[in-house]
């Protein structure tokens, strides 16, 4: 796997919710779902290279899978990893494409 593939596999997708929308407006923090094996340094370099922005800090947390029932069978949803990426002042990521 070359470095470009690793960058694309590190950041899975942006995590969009009311809380993350408020964070992005208030203090330019973007939330991503990232690979389970990703470290803070991996996420920082991937975001800086993919979106051409300057990252100030990265906080990562593991989200446990929730217990669910599938008919009579008890199971769990998949666990995943979330990264809070704080961008440097003057930098922004525009996912919609509108100016």
UniProtKB/Swiss-Prot annotation:
GO terms for cellular component: ribonucleoprotein complex; ribosome. Transmembrane segments: none annotated. It comes from the Bacteria. Gene3D superfamilies: 3.30.70.330. GO terms for molecular function: rRNA binding; structural constituent of ribosome. It comes from Francisella philomiragia subsp. philomiragia (strain ATCC 25017 / CCUG 19701 / FSC 153 / O#319-036). This is Large ribosomal subunit protein uL23. Signal peptide: none annotated. Part of the 50S ribosomal subunit. Contacts protein L29, and trigger factor when it is bound to the ribosome. InterPro entries: Nucleotide-bd_a/b_plait_sf, Ribosomal_uL23-like, Ribosomal_uL23/eL15/eS24_sf, Ribosomal_uL23_CS. One of the early assembly proteins it binds 23S rRNA. One of the proteins that surrounds the polypeptide exit tunnel on the outside of the ribosome. Forms the main docking site for trigger factor binding to the ribosome. The gene is rplW. PROSITE patterns: RIBOSOMAL_L23. One of its GO terms (biological process) is translation. The keyword Cytoplasm does not apply. PANTHER family: 60S RIBOSOMAL PROTEIN L23A. The keyword Ribosomal protein applies. Belongs to the universal ribosomal protein uL23 family. Keywords: Ribonucleoprotein, Ribosomal protein, RNA-binding, rRNA-binding.
